[in-house]
């Protein structure tokens, strides 16, 4: 292996180890990237974007572990209920569930939040987003509370009792209602 490749491999290995420990990041170690991070180095550096999170951590009596949650991203903050954002999607790894993608293909607009949760909670999160929309937003021009929410999954089954169905509508409501700008925890 050439010395340059070995040096890069060592640098990347050290970066991964220190980042996992919460220390310096690649940019801080001199690895060049295009652009400059925002003041928070977070998605909320984009004007108007708000994020809400609910994390569920519980050790159950039968030794199962709950390690899951919900993240809600509102691209225009609370205005996301009335003001659409241009949007598109793609399959990063060829599988995984994401609701609302047919409407993104057809209309090219996101009408509301993006919600992320575990694989087996996509359905409850989708339904909760629609319920939240009806309870908190105004009807559209036709008089309907119309929504095809964008809810995506991530597999957390190695860490979480994914078959326990621990994510409930209330968790989704809390993430949506708690969405704010500023630092993302």
Feature map (PLM): residue ranges:
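Positively charged n-region of N-terminal signal peptides that target proteins for export
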Residues: 1-5
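Bacterial N-terminal signal peptides
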Residues: 7-17
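Alpha/propeptide regions of enzymes that mature by internal proteolysis
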Residues: 21-185
């Amino acid at each position: 292996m050439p010395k340059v490749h070995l040096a890069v491999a060592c640098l990347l290995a050290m970066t991964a180890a220190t980042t996992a420990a919460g220390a310096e990041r690649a940019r801080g170690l001199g690895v060049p990237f295009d652009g400059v991070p925002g003041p928070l180095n977070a998605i909320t550096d984009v004007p108007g974007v708000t994020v809400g999170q609910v994390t569920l951590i519980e050790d159950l009596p039968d030794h199962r572990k709950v390690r899951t949650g919900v993240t809600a991203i509102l691209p225009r903050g609370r205005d996301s209920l009335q003001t659409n954002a241009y949007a598109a999607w793609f399959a990063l790894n060829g599988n995984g569930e994401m609701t609302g993608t047919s409407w993104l293909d057809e209309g090219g607009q996101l009408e509301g939040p993006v919600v992320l949760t575990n694989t087996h909670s996509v359905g409850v999160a989708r339904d909760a987003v629609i319920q939240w929309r009806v309870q908190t937003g105004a009807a559209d021009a036709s008089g309907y509370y119309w929504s095809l929410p964008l809810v995506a999954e991530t597999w957390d089954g190695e860490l979480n009792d994914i078959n326990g169905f621990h994510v409930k509508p209330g968790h989704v409501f809390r993430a949506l209602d708690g969405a704010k700008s500023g630092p993302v925890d």
